[in-house]
């Protein structure tokens, strides 16, 4: 067993393009995206699998991919978590509202946007079923570290020095069993949802 929990770890645009890191789990619709630059190298299916997006700052090469993220998820019945520095809520809302929508009944996407600040976080829900009304912002205390976690990992965020408000993120896997995806792909069994179910049972 190797300490690699993901079926896909992709530096989407290489080392010289817009910063985008895509992390995917085998057989689950809960991928993570670190930074929101140009993401045309990802398929709409990959973007539709996203559970959380982590924006470092709002320069164009870190934020321009938001439109495509929304396009891939607008027809889904899910909550997409999006994290970023100060003013992220308003900037995301303005981008979403710059388009017209048919608001079909099956379009049930909710974008939960969280701004991470010193000692506090602000959260707002942008809901398609309510036709994306102006966000109602809720403020909570925050210890300045863990901003997101699930059964497999947790993500920490810290403010860093830049010309604009900016965050750096660190991801840490939880202890447990992590399959070697290369060996799995070369065997008789194929990756799928059963992998996550097996890991869940092993962790109990």
Regions found by a protein language model. Name each.
Residues 120, 132-141:
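A conserved mid-domain beta-alpha-beta active-site/ligand-binding segment of alpha/beta enzyme cores
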Residues 38-84, 103:
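Active-site metal-binding motif and surrounding structural segment of the metallo-beta-lactamase
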Residues 100-119:
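A glycine-rich helix N-cap at a beta->alpha junction
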Residues 66-69, 92-96:
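Hydrophobic packing residues within well-ordered alpha-helices of enzyme cores
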Residues 1-46, 52, 168-171, 177:
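Conserved beta-strand hairpin/beta-sheet module of binuclear metal-dependent hydrolase folds
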Residues 86-89, 117-119:
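Short beta-alpha junction loops
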Residues 137-204:
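Metal-dependent phosphodiesterase/nuclease catalytic metal-binding core
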Residues 34, 57, 82, 155, ...:
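Divalent metal-coordination and catalytic microenvironments
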């Amino acid at each position: 067993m190797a300490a690699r929990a993901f079926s896909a770890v992709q530096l989407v645009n290489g080392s010289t393009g817009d910063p985008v890191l895509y992390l995917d789990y085998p057989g689950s619709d809960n991928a993570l995206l670190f930074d929101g630059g140009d993401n045309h190298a990802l398929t709409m299916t990959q973007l539709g699998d996203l559970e959380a997006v982590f924006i470092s700052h709002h320069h164009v090469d870190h934020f321009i991919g938001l439109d495509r993220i929304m396009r891939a998820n607008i027809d889904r019945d899910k909550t997409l978590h999006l994290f970023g520095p100060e003013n992220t809520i308003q900037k995301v809302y303005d981008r979403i509202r710059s388009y017209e929508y048919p608001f079909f009944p099956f379009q049930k996407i909710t974008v939960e946007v969280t701004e991470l600040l010193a000692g506090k976080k602000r959260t707002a829900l942008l809901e398609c079923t309510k036709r994306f009304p102006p966000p109602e912002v809720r403020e909570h205390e925050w210890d300045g570290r863990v901003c997101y976690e699930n059964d497999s990992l947790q993500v920490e965020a810290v403010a860093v020095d830049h010309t604009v408000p900016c965050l750096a993120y660190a991801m840490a896997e939880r202890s447990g069993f992590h399959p070697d995806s290369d060996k799995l792909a070369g065997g008789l069994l194929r990756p799928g949802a059963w992998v996550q179910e097996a890991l869940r049972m092993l962790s109990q």
